[in-house]
UniProtKB/Swiss-Prot annotation:
Protein name stated in the entry: tRNA uridine 5-carboxymethylaminomethyl modification enzyme MnmG
The protein's assembly and partners: Homodimer. Heterotetramer of two MnmE and two MnmG subunits.
Binding site for NAD(+): 276-290
Keyword set includes Cytoplasm: yes
Keywords: Cytoplasm, FAD, Flavoprotein, NAD, tRNA processing
Endpoints of the signal sequence: none
The species this protein was found in: Hydrogenovibrio crunogenus (strain DSM 25203 / XCL-2) (Thiomicrospira crunogena)
Gene Ontology cellular component list: cytosol
A single GO molecular function term of this UniProt record: flavin adenine dinucleotide binding
């Protein structure tokens, strides 16, 4: 074959959420990219729940968008219900979530792929990697076609040696209706990469025509509707639909308990030994682990504007089909419901992410990158974030430029990757805001301020996004400066109005920025004062200004903590360090340090159970060692 057809700079294997972001990122950066997928029609497929975002996950989507990724715009064009979670709480934990029309979402992703310059899409499953020593040089497909590139991004999802379980029956599958990648899984195992097995699951799908919606609680979306992308507009959203809420009950739980002898997880005859996602457990796990509860909430979510399928979020199961029917029909509003697709569990291979560099390149094979569920994560958003980072770094490597990854204080993507490569995972990893030490700095609303300039530098951010970002930043900086320079004196004509806004006496001269720091003073309220002048009308800028004012003290303190950590972050832990000589370290801490072998104090600080006090002791001892070696020298 012509080398122009077979030779590329970057090859991406897999067309799920990780693979599509990886391929788009590499191509946007100007390198010739090939996306190999089993099925072009399932590019960007939502294999499980029809939703994007949520606590921690929405933050990842905003960061992907700030770096020029596709997920946020795709959900803005396909979302059929939008909500802001934790709206009454602080800005650090507020998160956007949207129900998606599966078909529209897939179309939005495919449109971007097919119109992306430098990107070639080819439908063929990959069965082998082409290696030269410890370097990857290409991939071989099922029909024997060989494609060459010195950078390969592998995003295999749940397809590596995938096995589907329904009751005590099981069969090979990458997901329902798709074949697994068994030969590729076997080849990867031959490379002696550290491999394990994980499990995930999905609920049965229900026919909306057989559901009594009036018997359930309606859950509408937010008004006004939020948007995901910094370039998004509410006008992009299609028609909106409500979700509904119902509950399991004691009868539901009895059906589940009575069928555990047919469960692939609980029965002695069952074949599932792998670990499932802790924060998205099956309904049988919920009933057994929380036996004191007599009900569990179930969200009935539409799958699309033109589909009759409903997704009952909260009853993922691998119990036999007959039991699944009993479970569904035992709930209020679903007494006559008909199942259109059974729920199932799926086991698959993943590789210990501690074998990765922070760029997501494998340590063992140069030029080979892993992204998504192959690294032990769960969720579309986690996969997409890894895909973008891996695709970007594969392109940087092809361009012979320095690779990049965000720190924990720069992005949730940095938290995600650092957790994986430092701690590994024994269960499917899901992002939460609680995983980030500096979540006040890593808000949804400021992801563009943290990452868009980096994306622009690397060629990920186009002109339109950059101009919009620059305009926003200029407006915000000018308004902040104006508020900090505009003073109001206790004898000013509008002092009484200021006091009414603050609900406090104006005892000394203050700036408008100082007034805005008060919890009960909003920007819009300040703007009613005659002395205020022309107010900013962009609500995203107003939100930023209010957060800057009201959280200024907290942000400053968190920045101090970050600066301290950075100073110690890269302090190397000597290989010959004798932990037994460090008085004050507990035996548990010593054992964890021996098990994980962190290279730096920063890595040590993120090991579960390693306290700040232990890190301080390590730092003191390392400094003493350095002084001793210098004096001896």
């Amino acid at each position: 074959m012509d080398s122009k057809i077979t030779n590329f700079d970057v090859i991406v294997v897999g067309g799920g959420h990780a693979g599509t972001e990886a391929a788009l990122a590499a191509a946007r950066m100007g390198v010739r990219t090939l996306l190999l997928t089993d099925n072009i029609d399932t590019l960007g497929q939502m294999s499980c729940n029809p939703a994007i975002g949520g606590i921690g996950k929405g933050h990842l989507v905003k960061e992907i968008d700030a770096l020029g990724g596709a997920m946020a715009m795709a959900i803005d064009e396909s979302g059929i219900q939008f909500r802001t979670l934790n709206a009454s709480k602080g800005p650090a934990v507020r998160a956007t979530r949207a129900q998606a029309d599966r078909v529209l979402y897939r179309q939005a992703i495919r449109m971007r792929l097919e119109n992306q310059v430098n990107l070639t899409i080819f439908q063929q499953s990959v069965e082998d990697l082409i290696l030269e020593g410890d370097k990857v040089v290409g991939a071989e497909t099922k029909m024997g076609l060989k494609f060459y590139a010195h950078q390969v991004v592998l995003t295999a999802g749940t397809f590596l040696a995938g096995r589907i379980h329904i009751g005590l029956q099981n069969y090979e599958g990458g997901r329902a209706g798709d074949a697994p990648s068994n030969r590729l899984a076997a080849k990867l195992r031959e490379l002696a990469l550290p491999v394990g097995r994980l499990k995930t699951g999905t609920p049965p799908r229900i026919d909306a025509r057989t559901v009594d919606f009036e018997a359930m609680q309606m859950q509408p979306g937010d008004d006004p509707m939020p948007v995901f992308s910094y370039m998004g507009k509410v006008s992009m959203h299609p028609e909106q639909m409500p979700c509904y809420i119902t509950y399991t009950n004691e009868q539901t739980h009895d059906f589940i308990r009575d069928s555990l002898d047919q469960s692939p997880m609980y029965s002695d005859a069952g074949e599932i030994d792998s670990v499932g996602p802790r924060y998205c457990p099956s309904i049988e796990d919920k009933v057994m682990r929380f036996s004191e509860r007599n009900q569990h909430q179930v969200f009935i979510e539409p799958e699309g504007l033109t589909s009759n399928e409903l997704y009952p979020n909260g009853i993922s199961t691998s119990l036999p089909f007959e039991t699944q029917m009993q479970i569904v029909q035992s709930m209020k509003g679903l007494e006559n419901a008909r199942i259109m697709r059974p729920g199932y569990a799926i086991e698959y291979d993943y590789f210990d992410p501690r074998g990765l560099r922070p760029t997501l390149e494998t340590q063992a094979i140069h030029g080979l990158y892993f992204a998504g569920q192959i690294n032990g994560t769960t969720g579309y958003e986690e996969a997409a974030a890894q895909g973008l980072l891996a695709g970007m770094n594969a392109a940087r490597r092809a361009q012979m430029k320095e690779q990049w990854y965000p720190r924990r204080d720069e992005a949730y993507i940095g938290v995600l990757v650092d957790d994986l490569i430092t701690l590994g995972t024994s269960e499917p990893y899901r992002m939460f805001t609680s995983r980030a030490e500096y979540r006040l700095m890593l808000r949804e609303d400021n992801a563009d301020q943290r990452l868009t300039a980096i994306g622009r530098e690397f060629g990920l951010v186009d002109d339109a996004r950059w101009l919009s970002f620059e305009g926003k930043m200029e407006t915000m900086e000018a308004e902040l400066a104006r508020l900090k320079q505009t003073w109001i004196h206790p004898k000013h004509a509008e002092a009484k109005k200021a006091e009414a806004l603050m609900d406090l006496p104006l005892s000394k001269e203050q700036t408008l920025f100082d007034l805005l720091k008060r919890p009960n003073v909003s920007y819009d309220a300040l703007a009613t004062m005659d002395m205020f002048g022309n107010a900013v009308t962009d609500p995203t800028v107003v939100e930023q200004i209010e957060i800057e004012a009201k959280y200024a003290g907290y942000i400053a303190r968190q920045q101090e903590d970050i600066d301290k950590l950075r100073r110690a972050e890269n302090v190397e832990i000597p290989d010959a360090l004798d932990l037994d000589k460090i008085s004050g370290l507990s035996n548990e801490v010593k054992q964890k340090l021996r098990d994980h072998k962190p290279a730096t104090l920063g890595m040590a600080s993120r090991i579960s159970g390693i306290t700040p006090a232990a890190v301080s002791l390590l730092l003191i001892y390392i400094k003493k060692l350095r002084k001793t070696s210098q004096s001896v020298g």
